[in-house]
Amino acid sequence: MHLARLFIFVSLFSSVSTFSQQESYYYNFWNVQQYYLPALTGIENKHEAVVLARDQWIGLNGRPRTINVQYAQKLEKINSGIGFIYQVQKIGYSQVQKAKLSYAYHLKLGEKQLLSFGTNVGLNFLKFKADWVPPTTEPDPSLPSEKLQTNFSADFGVNYKHSNWQIGLGMTQLTNQRKTDSFTFTYARHYYLQSSYKFRFGEQMELTPRLLFQTDFVKIAATLNVQFKVNRWFQFGLAARNTEFLGANVGCYFLKKFYLGYSAQITFGPIMDLNKFYTHEAVLSFTIPN
């Protein structure tokens, strides 16, 4: 019932497109969900470390490139999870580095129910350096050439889990920044709604559909991702987004604690009229289960 409602919700926003981005649109979003849904910090494993690299729209000058590193640890004695996040993203002339600390509290509501609250706090470091080519030989003072900026950042999230189903709401970049000059870079608030359900077939096979809605109330992205775990060491999946995007992935588990995955995505619509741009993602994770 819950999944049916969410699939209907996807169709309502299937015609909405995105035009720009401050936050990355990950294909393997469940691997970095601590970033946008801090309530999930330390919720599944005793220890979990993830490195994810994303190269978006290969062939496009100034394309977005992102590296995300995160770690989480479960503190079962105090029903909590702690961790940290480091992200660096380059788009055009700008580079933004984000360093965050994560905390979540896990409230048990029953044998199979868990309600979690979490937050990320940290700093955003912006570096902007441009080499403009104006139409005249005279320098244009309205074009910024270089800027360094540091801002405090705070995120919040809440998540409910019942057996194999979970749903969560996350909010990033909650703090407002005051403009000190005409070139001040401000971070827009982003809101996330995520849900998933894990179907088990025997001891090894699993089918997990996931839905993620991401918006800053200017644009909306709705991503449907379906993962099929064939056995203890191999999985594959498909994904689609309302922003004219299709993708596929493969991944393998090895040495019992490691996962290595790769995904490729293709974008349709206006950007494809220029050229065939593809996006690649690679993820490596290490987990020690409960």
Tell where the protein language model's regions lie, with residue ranges:
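Sec-dependent signal peptide recognition
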Residues: 2-9
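Hydrophobic alpha-helical membrane-interaction elements
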Residues: 11-13
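N-terminal signal peptide c-region/cleavage motif recognized by signal peptidases
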Residues: 15-17
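Subset of outer-membrane beta-barrel
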Residues: 21-290
